[in-house]
């Protein structure tokens, strides 16, 4: 849903109350650095020697922070804060040195099976290729997520690394499942927390699996909003990103996409076929077949169809912006009408203005951009080109086809009315 999988994982971790986060990077490390910036610490795994080796690269981070350590896969986006929190509670209650977060699934083919002892503790994790027929029938599988006691984890990982270096362990790689067995060999306890949702095990190794994750995430978000009072009569093509907030009794129609941290109020109609990105739309707005980027639309506005609102714009209360209008970096006052085929760029419009068909604010001279000001109650005739910097005074009008070019505090032309006699 327009966000890297790692963002979903980090969001769940932070929601669970964990602030100290370290990401182990490998292939494409430069892209990860650019994306994460300074939001969390990163360390590089220069050689791909397994998940155990990857976590060992964060050894100084683990030793510095101490205590219990959560290890997650960066490409398993459906881990959630409740699962993390509840697994930690079990980890501490049972006195485990390692607790694997598991899931029960109908078809465990390809996953490591959780083999438990008679007392309920984890005896080992058996991979598909090594499982006996009895073990292969086990439906509880390893999600790849673990809680570790930090000191036990580092002791195990260092031991596994030394065994690999000395040739005692002939395997090229070592894994977190190996760390579990190493910790068990110290006489310490291993446990398992079974998550409520099996979705936590899901990851993506190709575009088909990525599409499946996106569809599952999309359905989750839509159901969340529908349960909160948002109407989505037909969900085809509707995408709502996790950061979006939508008020009750708003209707989202087919083909609409709501991205980023957009906020939409109550009793709105969005769509069909609309895009709202990082924008705020207040109550009672109609937004039809239009796009809005990083802007604010105030209550009661009527937008569309085929309107493009570019960043930095504020559309006032009860404003009408009709078909084939573009607004860019402009403020439009309440009750103003821009009905069709116009461009309003780098402009400040007052209240109660009427913009005729085919009007434009010419904001670019070829080397700089300037602003246009239209004051309250002005009437801009069709095919007017306002060449910035220019000002149209209060209650003034321009005749059809005019091209005002001068800044004036006085009206461009006073309105006239017919009088008897």
Give the positions of each predicted feature.
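Conserved N-terminal catalytic core of the sugar/cofactor nucleotidyltransferase
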Residues: 3-89
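Conserved core of the sugar-phosphate nucleotidyltransferase
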Residues: 19, 30, 34, 38, ...
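Structural beta-sheet core signal
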Residues: 22-23, 70-71, 98-101, 192
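Generic preference for hydrophobic
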Residues: 42-43, 125, 192, 232, ...
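Short beta-strand-to-turn element immediately C-terminal to the catalytic PLP-Schiff-base lysine
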Residues: 114-117, 147-148, 204-205, 241, ...
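Conserved alpha/beta core of the MobA/IspD/sugar-nucleotide pyrophosphorylase nucleotidyltransferase superfamily
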Residues: 139-246
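Phosphate-binding active sites in nucleotide-utilizing proteins
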Residues: 236, 241-286, 290
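Glycine-rich hexapeptide-repeat left-handed beta-helix
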Residues: 278-280, 286-421
